Each structure stands twice: as C-alpha cells, then as structure tokens.
C-alpha cells in the first residue's frame, strides 16, 4: 500500500506569493509542486521566458505518490487521445504565461503497444500546432542506452522547440 502525500500541495494564495517573489526578483527560482494547470492559472499572462519540460510518458511510469483517486495523473490515461488532450490543456496554460519572445523545450518519449510504435511525440506536436503553437524544430537527443531487443536500434528521444 502506497502512502498518499498531500503535505507538499499548496493553496492558490501561497502559489501566488511564491510566483510574485520570483517575478519581483526576490529569488531566482521557487519550486512549486501541484497540478500544473491549477498552479499555472495563478501566474500572470506573459511572465515566463522559457519553459523546459519532460511530461510523464504515456503508460511508461507510475507517478502515484501524492495522487488521490480523484486526481488525473498525466501519463496514466487509458487512450493516447486522452493523454494528448490532457497535455494540450497544460500547454494551453503554458502558452498563456509564456512571453511572445519565449521558448518551449519539450522532451517527450514514445511507446510501443503490441510492437506498434504509437507516435506520441508526433501526436502531441500536431495537436499543439492545432492549438496555436508554432513548431520550430524537431531535435534528436541521442541516448547511449536503451533498446527493447526486438526494435531497431534507435537510442534517441524527440525534443520539440
């Protein structure tokens, strides 16, 4: 039985105070843990220069710690379409808080089901374009480890900027 932790979740007022400290230059960063859409809703528009993120890969990790049965855990959706839709929801908030001169760096992994590559990076990139994002580049991150044995030897992940 896994223990559910909620002591690190912050209320909206506390999040706004932490965001204000960073934006006012009182500190260089602040770690805020919580539901990304809720946390980002407390940020003012166009206040972030750069976002670098690697959201949970679809159906590849168990991030159960801290989640309650009512929580939606990104990466644990039943269908790829639901995963993509949930990510687009988060990135809609990111788009709002990102300055017009800002950049998003997104690292996203893929998944095989029954030896069929799901194309999750492509699905997410196309959905983000449909949501108004501009895709500037597809960056290959060469990794030195990793192969499922029955797949061609591709040791890389897609990054999107």
Name every feature range the model reports, one short phrase each.
Residues 1-161:
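Core catalytic lobe of class I
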């Amino acid at each position: 039985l896994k223990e559910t932790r909620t002591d690190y979740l912050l209320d909206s007022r506390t999040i706004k105070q932490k965001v204000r400290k960073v934006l006012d230059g009182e500190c260089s960063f602040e770690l805020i843990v919580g539901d990304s859409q809720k946390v980002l809703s407390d940020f003012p528009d166009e206040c972030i220069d750069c976002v670098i993120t690697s959201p949970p890969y679809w159906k590849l990790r168990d991030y159960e710690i801290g989640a309650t049965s009512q929580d939606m855990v990104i990466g644990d959706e039943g269908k790829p379409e639901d995963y993509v839709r949930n990510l687009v929801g988060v990135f809609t908030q990111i788009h709002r808080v990102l300055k017009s001169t800002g950049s998003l760096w997104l690292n996203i992994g893929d998944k095989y089901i029954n030896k069929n590559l799901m194309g999750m990076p492509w699905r997410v990139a196309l959905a983000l374009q449909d949501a108004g994002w501009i895709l500037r580049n597809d960056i290959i991150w060469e990794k030195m480890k990793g192969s499922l044995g029955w797949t061609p030897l591709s040791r890389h992940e897609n990054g999107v900027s």
